[in-house]
From Swiss-Prot:
Zn(2+) binds at H12, H14, H197, D278. Belongs to the metallo-dependent hydrolases superfamily. Adenosine and AMP deaminases family. Adenosine deaminase subfamily. One of its GO terms (biological process) is inosine biosynthetic process. InterPro entries: A_deaminase, A_deaminase_dom, Ado/ade_deaminase, Metal_Hydrolase. Binds 1 zinc ion per subunit. It catalyses: adenosine + H2O + H(+) = inosine + NH4(+); 2'-deoxyadenosine + H2O + H(+) = 2'-deoxyinosine + NH4(+). This is Adenosine deaminase.
């Protein structure tokens, strides 16, 4: 199912959406934070999706528990370290871990730049212990507004040498991308790549805006592109990468079933699209789950799965020499 001659990558993976249940339990008790359950087993349903069905509201409540226990910078560093470990344990050769320092800082009023530094330190520590290639993507959480996003961006750009890209995430309908054009001019001036969550809650126009005004060369989710034939043609012709997250889309009710997911529509249109986990801690999945699910639930052949694997490597925010090195390591 997984082609072992092709690097296995996960490019849309939220570091702050992948906190182990045991870590939430440990940090909650360490910092005297009231948890919603009295046992580790009882905690799991409050922080992870149980079964296939969910809603965006239920999903986000679980996600909030992942950052509710980040009471100090050591906790942030631990979570970053464990994200590297989890990426390696799940069999990934390369992962891009994205994080919103404002979101991670807000519950316990941590310094935003301190959170950025703690994430970088945790990842560096993880890379000493685990054999996996990792890059970081900074997130601006649009739901907190323009001013908060500018604070977040400045904290991230102070450490831009440790980032490969910036992302825009959060409430796509309430905070459209046009509110952040000035922010992304700073990102482009800093020389970072750009991805954006778009076409998930809003329509194709949100994706056009992200590409034409923000400068995005990759789009997170993008499921609503299929309603705009011109956009689909543009995506294919310009090799705009679509970071597809089928299980997450099901869990947030972006799609109602795997069979309804537009992954195959994108592939048949020649769009560059790859498989990703999104918030693997909340969804209780790993990357192999996504490949297995696409095969079993959506009828993809092994050849099509291999193409998805290759697409992921092509879409990665790495140099051609780094891409070659990933392939060479699989030979």
């Amino acid at each position: 199912m997984i082609d072992t001659s092709i690097p296995l990558v996960d490019l849309h993976r939220h570091l702050d959406g992948n906190v182990r249940v045991e870590t939430i339990w440990d940090l909650g008790h360490q910092h005297n934070i009231a948890l919603p359950a009295d046992t580790l087993e009882g905690l799991a349903p409050f922080v992870q999706i149980q079964g296939k069905e969910s809603s965006l509201v239920a999903f986000l409540k679980k996600l909030d528990w992942m950052v509710a226990v980040l009471a100090d910078l050591d906790a942030v560093k631990r979570v970053a370290y464990e994200n590297v470990a989890d990426a390696a344990i799940s069999g990934l050769d390369y992962a891009e871990l994205r994080f919103s320092p404002y979101y991670m800082a807000m519950n316990h009023k941590l310094p935003i730049e301190g959170v950025v530094e703690a994430v970088i330190d945790g990842v560096k520590a993880g890379l000493k212990d685990y054999e996996v290639k990792i890059n970081l993507i900074g997130i601006m959480s649009r739901s907190f507004g323009q001013d908060a996003c500018m604070q977040e961006l400045e904290a991230l750009l102070a450490h831009k040498q440790h980032l490969v890209a910036m992302d825009l995430a959060g409430d796509e309908l309430g905070f459209p991308g046009a509110l952040f054009n000035d922010h992304f001019k700073k990102v482009r001036d800093a020389g970072l790549a750009i991805t954006a969550h778009a076409g998930e809650a809003a329509g194709a126009e949100s994706m056009w805006q992200a590409i034409q005004e923000l400068g995005a060369t990759r789009i997170g989710h993008g499921v609503n592109a299929i309603h705009d034939p011109k956009l689909m043609e543009y995506l294919a012709a310009n090799r705009i990468g679509i970071e597809s997250c089928p299980t997450s889309n099901l869990h947030t009710s972006t799609v109602t079933s795997y069979q309804e997911h537009p992954l195959r529509t994108f592939m048949e249109a020649g769009v560059l699209i790859g498989l990703n986990t999104d918030d693997p801690g909340v969804s209780a999945i790993d990357i192999k789950h996504e490949y297995r699910t696409v095969k079993q639930e959506m009828g993809f052949s092994d050849a099509e799965l291999a193409q998805l694997q290759r697409n992921g490597v092509e879409m990665a925010f790495i140099s051609d020499s780094e891409r070659k090195a990933l392939y060479a390591a699989k030979a």
